[in-house]
Amino acid sequence: LPIGITTSLKGTLMAIFDARYDSSRDLQGDIDIAMMRSLDGGMSWQPMQIVLDRKKWGGLPEKYNGISDACILTDEKNGTIYVAGLWMYGVLDPRSGKWVEGMTQDSTRWIHQWHAKGSQPGLGVKETCQFLITKSVDDGLTWSDPVNITAQTKKPEWWLYAPAPGHGITLKDG
């Protein structure tokens, strides 16, 4: 099931969802934000494309660079499509809340940001999930490099940061 759906100003239907490769569990894991486009109101769909993927960022395998809980919206003024998601880098120790060094593809440690000390106060990638946003100006065919807007949207003293997935809104005043 899609997490979010929007219709572009050109009438293209876009559905976004988590592409979970290794398991059905939530972050942390090898998860990307994927999208499918329909040009005929949902009767048929183009192949899945990946919209947000951190790959092996920071030297960690993809299973420790997961992105989940996407939100999509169409800017009704200029037609730009935005997709945002939560990126979790590495793993925090559930007892100490400290970032675990040396994670590899063979590592089996896992903690969800909502459990124990899986998320911490602060803004850094080794403290808390990061809020990333990408945009498309060509009706969802291509996407910009992700921009990290965590420092603009999360207060450093917050422990847990989890903007909800779904469909975003635009306001008349911007």
Question: Locations of the language-model features?
Answer:
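Asp-box/BNR beta-propeller blade signature and adjacent active/binding-site loops
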Residues: 1-174
